[in-house]
Amino acid sequence: MSTLDIHQIAVLSDNYIYLVRCRATGACAVIDPSLAEPVLAAAESLGWTITHILNTHHHYDHTGGNEEIKAATGCEIIGFAGDAHRLPGIDRTVVEGDRVAIGQAEARVIETPGHTLGHIAYWFAESSALFCGDTLFSAGCGRLFEGSAGQMWDSLRKLRALPAQTLVFCGHEYTQPNITFALTIDPRNEALRARALEVDALRAAGRPTVPAFLGDEARSNPFLRADSADFQEAFGMTGADPVEVFARTRLKKDHF
């Protein structure tokens, strides 16, 4: 049973900010605030009191609201120890396996280098909620700005190993273009084709495609399928090292 209330805020062209609130205590965290004003307005409208900010990585579209929200609320800012020098206003640092308590709701920290070297995710197991920033997207993954293909593949495998019913809350609304790309390299994937229809219907109705179930991602996201025999066959890389398959997939997406 979920211990969290989750409120999703769409900002900029395609970013998502998340407010997560412990139902038992009212403690509330903001995850990846690119902007302050929409967060403060949403919290006031909901009657939620912000106590924490959780950053997944240092990019400004995930941290731009840190200091203004902290000044307005006195909240504690939490992020990866190795990126402390790049996270505005940080108060507390965490590493792999650390636990972060938002009231009685607890998240496990998972290090996910690749998009950036200091990227982390927060997994609230009791609520089946994964906040993964720009590592894993719905039907895609983040670009490799700092890390290697091997690092990113290892990070994605760590996330893929979580329970299939986990809800994936990522940092951007990229699902539709991600699926358009995926269909060019994995066109016979029935799970992917079914998702394409669902996603088109959601976007036509003006609705978000995030969150997505991790089990659906495992079946349809090409970046989670680099070690899948049928994906390797479809991609013309049967028997190849999954890191090489992932790297080739990422390169094709970068130039799509």
Swiss-Prot record:
**EC number from the UniProt entry:** 3.1.2.6
Locate the residues binding Zn(2+) 1: 57, 59, 115, 134
Show the catalytic activity: an S-(2-hydroxyacyl)glutathione + H2O = a 2-hydroxy carboxylate + glutathione + H(+)
Biological processes, Gene Ontology terms? methylglyoxal catabolic process to D-lactate via S-lactoyl-glutathione
Instruction: Write out the residues that bind Zn(2+) 2.
Output: 61-62, 134, 172
Source organism, top-level taxon: Bacteria
Listed pathway(s): Secondary metabolite metabolism; methylglyoxal degradation; (R)-lactate from methylglyoxal: step 2/2
Q: Which GO terms describe its molecular function?
A: hydroxyacylglutathione hydrolase activity; metal ion binding
Q: Which cofactor does it need?
A: Zn(2+)
Q: In UniProt terms, what function does this protein have?
A: Thiolesterase that catalyzes the hydrolysis of S-D-lactoyl-glutathione to form glutathione and D-lactic acid.
Which protein is depicted? Hydroxyacylglutathione hydrolase
Instruction: Give the source species.
Output: Rhodospirillum rubrum (strain ATCC 11170 / ATH 1.1.1 / DSM 467 / LMG 4362 / NCIMB 8255 / S1)
